[in-house]
Structures are given as C-alpha cells and as structure tokens.
Amino acid sequence: MQIDIRKEGAVTLVEVRGRATIGAGNDTLAGKLRETIDGGAAKIVVNLEGITQIDSSGISTLVRNYVTLGKKGGALKLLKPTGRVRDVLEVTRLMSCIPTFDDEAKALASFK
C-alpha cells in the first residue's frame, strides 16, 4: 500500500493506493491515519480512488477514524470511491454515514 499526505489549507488529504484488506495494507492505512490525527489533523479527506479492494478491516479503519475525529470535533470524509470499493461502501451503507464526494474541490469546500 502506498499513502501520500498533503495539506490544502486546514484540510489534510490522504491519498491511498493498493488494497485496504486485513494484513499489512490495512495496518499501514490505520497507522498513517492514527499518526495524522495524533499530529493534530482535524479535517481529513481520504481519497479512495487508488484502492483496488477493501474488506471489513478496511471498513473498520475508516469508521474508527471517522468516530475518533468526530469525538475530537473534527471530521473525516471520503473521496472518489470507485468500482468494487464503491459497491462495498454502498452495500454497507457507509456512504450514507460518512460524507462521500466524487470531486476534490467539493470535498474541500464542505469543510467551510
């Protein structure tokens, strides 16, 4: 799994590529999100465009960090889920719980 992090004003964009499945891929994602939140990020957009597969452990990581940020007064939002990843998010109804966007500019603007 490859993860790149960049800042757009007060928003942290986490761009993820690879598989968010049980094991090393999801461990990497969970660790990077925890590190980002512990570093003070309160507004996070996770770009899922490069995720090729997600399972229950990947879903758990997204939900756990969404809840963690919410408790701290922040927010986690999702960006560009595609294909099977979008299907999983729709079936689990996660897209109705966590704000999800197909356009980066709209995701960023949603924090204002």
Could you say what each language-model-derived stretch is?
Residues 20-98:
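Amphipathic alpha-helical interaction surfaces in cytosolic regulatory modules
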Residues 1-15:
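Short beta-strand/loop segment at the start of cytosolic alpha/beta domains
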Residues 99-103:
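Short acidic-hydrophobic, aromatic-tinged amphipathic segments that line or gate anion-handling sites
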Residues 83, 105-106:
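Acidic phosphotransfer microenvironment of two-component signaling modules
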Residues 12, 20, 105:
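Residue-level detector of flexible, active-site-proximal loop/helix-junction positions
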Residues 107-112:
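Short, charged, intrinsically disordered terminal tails
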